[in-house]
Amino acid sequence: IERANQIAQTTELSANLAKGVKLIDARNKTDFAAGFIPGSINIQGNNAFATWAGWFLTYEEPFMIVASENQIEDLTRKLMRIGLDKVVGFVDNVTEWAAATGQQLETGKVISMDDLNELKQQNNLQLVDLRGAAEYNAGHIKGAEHVFVGTIEKNLDKVSKDRRVVILCQGGDRAAIAYSVLAKHGYHN
């Protein structure tokens, strides 16, 4: 873990990404949507961080984390408590990485309920509800497909690549995770 407490240099990050090392972006969903490294998964560094990381990481695979320097110790501790200790480094500035490599950051769009109501008027729209089964069964938007966020990678076949897709949950955190997973798998609709 001593090695993991170091901020990765641009070349180290690029080399790890080329080797397939997963990149977990722990920034808040708004900062993530404004610009993120392609292929990264947004799991916000809040109280649910370790829970969601446990759904998307295995105990064997190395990974890196995008986070501010003051979050590193806390996030590392949370992950170690559930056995995820293969952190190989941290990244604190995605903009510097993009500038140094010449690569473009991807962006996402956060929409409001008003935006959603407007989009629902379109025929070419798929709604994907990411909440748990009990939440979904207690009430959901008519026509929304249920795909629990923790299983989104195993259920990509349920998400259209041809239609416009709106993913939703209760507060947006799970939608940010699912958005990043979908973007990683080539969904840009």
Language model: regions and residue ranges:
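Rhodanese-like catalytic fold shared by cysteine-dependent sulfurtransferases
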Residues: 1-2, 29-126, 130-189
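C-terminal accessory/connector segments of nucleic-acid motor ATPases
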Residues: 1-19, 24, 28-32
